[in-house]
């Protein structure tokens, strides 16, 4: 392999693709999760209990789950740039439209429609990156992509808190300004996507002929060794036990990602009631700054050492243990520090997980597998927010719900160790089938 050709190609991709993809995901995550900040004002204006808020937060995932796999199947047929552009334009319109709701039912409907519009975006981007990046660079690429999500909280939470201060401007509530102003960028970027992204390396005019040839040959060689590949269709994903085991792990991890993210400002406000909404949003953003750091370090170290198992399983298990300590800590500062580390470690496995997954699946079956895994994980978003809200209404505390999250993370970490070891073995031996191993 020509090291200069390898380095120059990857560097060009990192400059051209990754920053743009990070911005797209940053906007996506802000629009999906800004309801957590809006709730600081919106719940009172719409007379919503914690359980009703949980329903509004969770109903997004009903449609998101239903349309996830079909969306990714369509993406493989019409091309990534067209479909991702469509997703962003429609979700931008709906996200901004949430500023018009007058009742909890209208909010439920708009959140449901937001899930329809956004379905397929995350797995679509993951599939897109797997079509460009060789295995040796994939975990780092995935970590940079998901840093966009963590940055959405680092930047988006304080930004959303600031927008709430527009309350009363032109007679409009702050949370309505929040939905309106944060929905517009998605619409505009959706148009840019169509003209900026290329569907495949072969079509990338910004790569030289030699770079295009090398990258295409490298990816084709790796894909030929992949268990679920171009010679399978989307139905293969539903029949492969390995895909379902990966789905279980991602579901357990999602209890932490979704459960904590959607309620973090409310949790912080509950223990720091004297703080302003802006300061609450800042305190809620700090854990995601650590998530950015942990994801990059864990992803890069995994690529350099070519080790997946410990990088996948250990952070989750430690995150679960730290969350349990935070729950029972009597010191608020210590509890907050432990919560920060919990969030960071929970997110740290993200690039490793998708590197392991995309080392196993490619093609139409791969796109469907990625979408299926993501859809199953989002069941946590459907079920857990209403349950978490109900627990808060009944017990006046989130502790019982957070214990569930901690146990899910510990169990998920144990599964991650097993999956990581099996994946390392299969990649090393270049096996052609995974179904016999599960």
What are these regions (language model features)?
Residues 140-164, 185-186, 374-384:
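Glycine-rich segments within core transmembrane alpha-helices of 12-TM secondary carriers
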Residues 110-147:
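Cytoplasmic helix-loop-helix junction between adjacent transmembrane helices
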Residues 306-356:
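C-terminal transmembrane helical hairpin of 12-TM major facilitator-type secondary transporters
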Residues 47, 79, 100-106, 117, ...:
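Helix-breaking motifs and short loop linkers at transmembrane-helix boundaries and internal kinks
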Residues 76-88, 303-316:
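Cytoplasmic membrane-interface "Motif A"-like loop-to-helix N-cap segments
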Residues 67-79, 294-307, 392:
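Helix-to-loop junctions at the C-terminal end of transmembrane segments
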Residues 35-36, 235-296, 350, 354, ...:
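Extracytoplasmic gate region of multi-pass secondary transporters
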Residues 66-105:
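Conserved MFS/SLC helix-loop-helix module at the cytosolic interface between two early adjacent transmembrane helices
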